[in-house]
């Protein structure tokens, strides 16, 4: 019926069938519908058979250690997870699957905790309701390394989507012990690890009687564990937004279930006003990203960006570790190349090194693993501008459960000093300088969109920009070959990071302009990062470059 409805729509047919969804290091993500370029049970089975071949190639013990499977609140997520389990079990791979939706970081934890060979999460994170995804992990709890992702992609090309799939009935697999459920016991193990991350929980006890927090899970997986961890931290007044505590993959109360947008917090803000609350915390549907809303000096509720929250946490974690004498000998803060340079200023001014990685938490996880292996540094905090934060060694993906807890601890610390988090953010600008950032997403859907993205990135290499808006370019970094070129003399030098389709422009006056195609959606992203003598100057620089971005990316 679904395909019959589009039989006369050539553009829709082409969009759904012109090529399969590409399996990348982030797995698969797409709109739910029939077609090889959409998310549906056939694509799930196909990807899972290809994944199973990679696990089987590791040997019998890898199959016995098996795979941990998780899913979020989205329409079809549980069904897709059970389908994946059925294919894995039929391939002789032991499956541990959660008995209901869980936060993404708990899957990363479960892989490490149970020593499984791999992990799989059915989620589209903060994307609109039409989307679902297939996110893959390896034995270290981090997202799949490139060589394994490439092997899965090759297997998908080789295997027929219908005839080469091994699967069995899910209930039969459970009865035979090939599939076992994870539940409360795993939750407790996860929460006990999260509870090791607070730096100075005493500050919470000092304010717990009067400090109120409003929480919303955006209809998703944080609904149980985030309020629970805040209570265990010592908070007594956690007010959960009742409508958004209802699990619903249609996200009926928001246009977009993304804590980046203030619109999603409308109900939570109303609740906060009724209860005179200073802090609102929101987590996305798979509970790996965290957004906050604060009262400003005039009593208005305002959102903070992922960059701002990351800087606040960087500064707080360093301050608290120094106060409690828990700072390691060689501490490091990690961030992605598109994340604010204010974090570097906050780290380095306090004697902590700051390292950059490519965009995506898998790259931050690789750096954490490198530090563990070579002993050169111990990371104390890792974050991205896209609202993802992590500390500790229990997981290898961004964690909204721990982030919510640390934000709440930080808020308590400032309350003991008679300050709000808004006051603290104002102090950050005084301490580290006035930074301003903006991310612009330009959607390029369908076949023509993919082609345009390729053409755009090639044009930027073939005809190098010399200025953007009114700003002259000092250096151009091309992260594909890993070269940094001085525009004055044309000389290039190699960079440590390479192999990603990113163009990075260092402009006069310390401003940055970055262009990259999204790894998960049909869009090009432009990141603008500016520093000024004051906030107005920094914002003006961003405005000029934002206007220029729309001319460059069209």
Question: Model-predicted segments: where are they?
Answer:
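An N-terminal, well-structured beta->alpha segment
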Residues: 1-84, 173-174, 179-210, 221
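Gly/Ser/Thr-enriched, mixed-charge loops and adjacent short helices
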Residues: 12-21, 132-266, 272
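Conserved phosphate/anionic-ligand binding catalytic regions in large, soluble enzymes, centered on
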Residues: 17-37, 124-127, 213, 217-225, ...
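N-terminal small/polar loop signature for handling phosphorylated ligands or for N-terminal nucleophile
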Residues: 68-131, 236-291
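Short Gly/Thr/Asp-enriched flexible loops that form oxyanion-binding sites at enzyme active sites
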Residues: 80-88, 131-138, 288-307, 343
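Glycine-rich phosphate-binding loop plus the immediately following alpha-helix
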Residues: 137-167, 307-330, 335-345, 400, ...
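Phosphate-binding and adjacent anionic-ligand microenvironments
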Residues: 273, 277-279, 300-302, 320-516, ...
């Amino acid at each position: 019926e679904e395909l019959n409805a589009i039989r006369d729509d050539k553009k829709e047919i082409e969009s759904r069938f012109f090529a399969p969804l590409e399996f990348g290091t982030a797995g698969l993500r797409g709109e739910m519908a029939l077609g090889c370029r959409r998310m549906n049970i056939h694509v799930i089975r196909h990807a899972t058979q290809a994944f199973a071949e990679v696990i089987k190639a590791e040997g019998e013990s890898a199959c016995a250690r098996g795979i941990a499977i998780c899913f979020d609140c989205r329409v079809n997520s549980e069904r897709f997870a059970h389908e994946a389990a059925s294919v894995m079990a039929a391939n002789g791979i032991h499956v541990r699957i959660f008995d209901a939706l869980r936060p993404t970081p708990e899957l990363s934890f479960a892989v490490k905790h149970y020593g499984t060979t791999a992990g799989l999460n059915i989620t589209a994170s903060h994307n609109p309701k039409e989307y679902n995804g297939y996110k893959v992990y390896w034995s270290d709890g981090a997202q799949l390394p490139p060589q394994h992702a490439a092997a899965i992609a090759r297997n998908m090309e080789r295997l027929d989507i219908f005839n080469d799939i091994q699967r069995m009935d899910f209930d039969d697999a459970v009865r035979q012990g090939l599939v076992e459920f994870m539940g409360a016991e795993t939750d407790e193990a996860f929460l006990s690890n999260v509870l090791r991350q607070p730096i100075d929980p005493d500050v919470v006890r000092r304010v717990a009687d009067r400090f109120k927090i409003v929480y919303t899970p955006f209809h998703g997986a944080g609904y149980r564990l985030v309020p629970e961890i805040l209570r265990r931290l010592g908070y007594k007044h956690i007010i959960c937004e009742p409508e958004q505590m209802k699990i619903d993959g249609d996200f009926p109360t928001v246009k977009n279930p993304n804590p980046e947008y203030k619109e999603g917090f409308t109900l939570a803000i109303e609740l906060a006003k009724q209860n005179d609350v200073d802090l609102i915390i929101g987590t996305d549907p798979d509970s790996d990203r965290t957004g906050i809303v604060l009262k400003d000096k005039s009593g208005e509720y305002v959102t903070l960006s992922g960059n701002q929250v990351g800087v606040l946490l960087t500064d707080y974690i360093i301050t608290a570790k120094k106060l409690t004498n828990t700072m390691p000998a060689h501490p490091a803060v990690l961030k992605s190349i598109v994340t604010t340079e204010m974090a570097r200023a906050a780290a380095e001014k306090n004697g902590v090194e700051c390292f950059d990685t490519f965009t995506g938490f898998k790259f931050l996880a690789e750096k954490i693993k490198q530090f563990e292996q070579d002993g050169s540094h111990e990371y104390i905090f890792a974050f991205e501008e896209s609202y993802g934060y992590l500390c500790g060694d229990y997981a290898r993906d961004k964690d909204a459960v721990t982030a919510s807890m640390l934000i709440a601890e930080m808020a308590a610390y400032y309350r003991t000093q008679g300050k709000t988090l808004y006051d603290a953010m104002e102090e950050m600008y005084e301490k580290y300088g006035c930074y301003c950032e903006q991310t612009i997403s330009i959607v390029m859907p369908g076949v023509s969109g993919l082609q345009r993205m390729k053409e755009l990135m090639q044009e930027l290499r073939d005809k190098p920009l010399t200025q953007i808006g009114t700003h002259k370019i000092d250096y151009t970094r091309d992260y594909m070959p890993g070269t940094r070129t001085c525009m004055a003399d044309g000389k290039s030098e190699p960079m440590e990071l390479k192999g990603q389709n990113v163009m990075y422009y260092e402009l006069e006056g310390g401003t940055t302009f970055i262009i990259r195609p999204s790894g998960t959606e049909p869009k090009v992203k432009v990141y603008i990062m500016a520093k000024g003598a004051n906030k107005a100057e920094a914002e003006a620089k961003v405005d000029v470059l934002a206007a220029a971005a729309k001319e460059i990316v069209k």
